[in-house]
Amino acid sequence: MDLKKTLLMPKTSFAMQANLSTSEKNFHDFWKDKKVFQKLKKQNKGKQIKILHDGPPYANGSIHVGHALNKILKDFILRSWLYEGYDVVFIPGWDCHGLPIEHAVSKKNPSSYSNLSTVEKRKLCHQFALSQIAVQKEQFQRLGLLNDFQNCYYTIDESFQFKELELFLQAIKKGLIFQDLKPTYWSPISRTSLAEAEIEYKEVNSIALYLTFKVSKSDFLDENANLLVWTTTPWTLPTNQAIAIHPDFDYLLFEYNQQKFVILEKLFEVFTNKLNWTNAIKLKKFKGSNLKNSSYSHCFYNKVLPVLMGIHVVDNEGTGIVHSSPAFGIDDFYLCQKNKIKEVLISIDEKGVFNNLLNDKELENCFYLKANDLIINRLKQNNSFIFSEVISHREPHDWRSKTPVIYRASKQLFIKTKSIKKQLKKQINQVNFLNSKNQLRLKEMLLQRDEWCISRQRVWGLPIPIVYANNKPLLDFSTIQYTIKQLKKHGIDSWFEKDVTCFLKPDKTKKWVKYHKEIDTLDVWFDSGSSYNVLEINKYGSIADLYIEGSDQYRGWFNSSSNCGIIQNDLIPFKSLVSHGFTLDENGNKMSKSLGNIVDPLKICDQYGADILRLWVANTDWQIDNKIGVNILKQVAEQYRRIRNSLLRFILGNINGFNFTSMDDYKFSLEDKIVIHKTNSLVEQIEKFLEKYNFLGCLKVINKFVLWLSSWYFEIIKDTLYCDAKNNPNRLAKQAVLNYIFTQLISFLNIFIPHTAEDAWKNYSFNKKPISVNLFTKPTVFKVANSKNLENIYKTFTSIKNAAFKEIEKLRKEGLISKNNQIELTVGINKKIPKKLKDNLALWLNVNSVNLTNNENEIKVKKTKKTMCERCWNFQTIIKQKLDHNLCSRCFKVC
């Protein structure tokens, strides 16, 4: 007789090797063919709605690992809401306007692009954006996201754009829009103004220059005194229009080499030590206010200019005397305006090149940074140069082109965010944050800005619906309302095709007035900031339950969305807000092409599988920056194999063909009840973690549970599962417990590794199951009686087990035993233990027998002399012969 054939060994088609890179695509096809997402929406219709609003990624290029982190986190949240029984709303979106798309299109045909009309350029940009969206859609779906990507929003949708224009109209109604000539961030490479949200700071090396301006007139200083000035922008010196001195700081007049100089007293030692002016003589100390109404001569033009009192002057760097060029510095601009210096010398054009404003032939057509050397040489020629050095400091850069930006005065359109600060502050206090520090962070970002520059000098964007009469913007509500009405009638691109009169009320047009349309387009942050309107378009209101994006969005999307929401609806458009960190390489470095350390999420999916990438996300403390790389992914893959094989494959193999009825129909043993209780406790823990989006906490307790199950319960029930009669009540009860564990955990695993969960569900032999695990609703919890007593029993068992296994391990190392079931164990215990535990100790310890004594701490281990059953390999006293095989009484009956 072949004894192996009499055993009930595990059988399942759920493979040990996942082959995720291949199998995952099959499940995508399955979900699509079976319309699983549509069935899920239908199944949840009528339930309480919960909305996660998607911050739109930019429609250009392939997705990167940061995109993957973002979308996978959102998918975790959506799936956890579905588990809790909500009707979940998530509409994927794309940000489609802006410079990168315009650049990408122009690069394709650089010679012909410049000859195209505005509308032709816009059509090419529109087509390009849609092509990029198609690519990214497919890539996002590779991540196993629970969405069919059929109902999406694009910021170039007409419905979206007209909602955005309604927001603009509301800003007009509230008197928040104004035009002004003032310095804003300007990108010479992109040739457009930028908002603060589009700026990032980089550490760079720059020239720091010390120079002098000679006093021309002063009631306090001699005319031959030199004002020491420090600047890191020598190229702005030609447009110097004033010098700023802090009225309350202490300044010093000192003499060196028969020349007199003025500097901030606090910085005197630093300056003289730097130049080794050891013989400098201090002459007198005075307050900056003493130089009020003084004047000086320009460093190389024949001009006499004023010394102004400026409280923006700092005392921790430079000289405490600041050169002011109102065209290229915001503090300079406001200081000069306050002192009635209205002229703004904009000597740099939109490309960053000197124009002919200064009538300085040497500077004309010179790029601003290249002008530094020329200007320093001039200063040397007229003895105004003191010293220059290269310093490392932070300078603003365009966050898209990664190139330096400058402050440059130009006529722009602004929103008076100062007027809505009170509402913003009140509303932010009502938003839920996982971390209170982030609430403070957003509040600071919102309240530090008084205005928002919303105009961009680009073709590819939503046109600003303003008409000018004799170069003055018509900002009255009725005019703008009519203009938008005409755009709705003729289409957005009609703005670039039709005559200006089309957008003016006939009774408002006057023959003697010259009209023209605004040629700038709206800031892309105004686009994405108004994206909450998508919810209203889809009849879900205008407030989402949750916004979640990267931590850089406090100055970006979180900021613009808050401002737009207050302007349009007097409400911030989210109830809760959380942010995630950035992805770094394995060594903690920022990823970049130049370093060659970019981790491609699509390559991870092809090599390891999307479920491994998703499991990596679940294993991160995602609110901070996290590392990813080959070694980290290998660790994640090992964890995955444990879940797949030690948990899912073991269960599926042992419940194959099991006809489960109701949990009440089975008589559970003590160990069964403990496992059911532990499973219920695990479910409670996971649900609490999910409420806080603590996915790492979920994975930790799941892994701990799997290790516990596989090392104890699964080990001690193998004998029953494999060797008992198929319909033995005890065996059926064990199968019911395994089935219970599977049904309780599969929904949680579907949150994190949906392809694997679907694979397991496909191999789950229960004929009343839904077609997909995604349609499986939250299962009922089966409560076991006296759960506290079960905990105490297991706690007592654990203390016995830990002590006994130390001795057992000694015998194993000495080679005296190979299996625990060969052991006869004597354990001394000084306290009463429940009879139920006594009766189960041998089984739970997986040993042959246990003898309890009263001798505290006594532990004896010896090898049994009993005979081994050839079928179950257990050692028994009574052994029966059957067809030349030694069998225990149980195996004798089964065979």
Curated annotation (Swiss-Prot):
It comes from the Bacteria. Binds 1 zinc ion per subunit. SUPFAM superfamilies: Anticodon-binding domain of a subclass of class I aminoacyl-tRNA synthetases, Nucleotidylyl transferase, ValRS/IleRS/LeuRS editing domain. Keywords: Aminoacyl-tRNA synthetase, ATP-binding, Cytoplasm, Ligase, Metal-binding, Nucleotide-binding, Protein biosynthesis, Zinc. It is found in: Cytoplasm. L-isoleucyl-5'-AMP binds at E549. Its EC number is 6.1.1.5. One of its GO terms (biological process) is isoleucyl-tRNA aminoacylation. Disruption phenotype: Probably essential, it was not disrupted in a global transposon mutagenesis study. Zn(2+) binds at C869, C872, C888, C891. A motif ('HIGH' region) lies at residues 57-67. GO terms for cellular component: cytosol. It catalyses: tRNA(Ile) + L-isoleucine + ATP = L-isoleucyl-tRNA(Ile) + AMP + diphosphate. One of its GO terms (molecular function) is aminoacyl-tRNA deacylase activity. IleRS has two distinct active sites: one for aminoacylation and one for editing. The misactivated valine is translocated from the active site to the editing site, which sterically excludes the correctly activated isoleucine. The single editing site contains two valyl binding pockets, one specific for each substrate (Val-AMP or Val-tRNA(Ile)). Catalyzes the attachment of isoleucine to tRNA(Ile). As IleRS can inadvertently accommodate and process structurally similar amino acids such as valine, to avoid such errors it has two additional distinct tRNA(Ile)-dependent editing activities. One activity is designated as 'pretransfer' editing and involves the hydrolysis of activated Val-AMP. The other activity is designated 'posttransfer' editing and involves deacylation of mischarged Val-tRNA(Ile). Belongs to the class-I aminoacyl-tRNA synthetase family. IleS type 1 subfamily. This is Isoleucine--tRNA ligase. It comes from Mycoplasma genitalium (strain ATCC 33530 / DSM 19775 / NCTC 10195 / G37). The lineage of its organism: Bacteria, Bacillati, Mycoplasmatota, Mycoplasmoidales, Mycoplasmoidaceae. The gene is ileS.
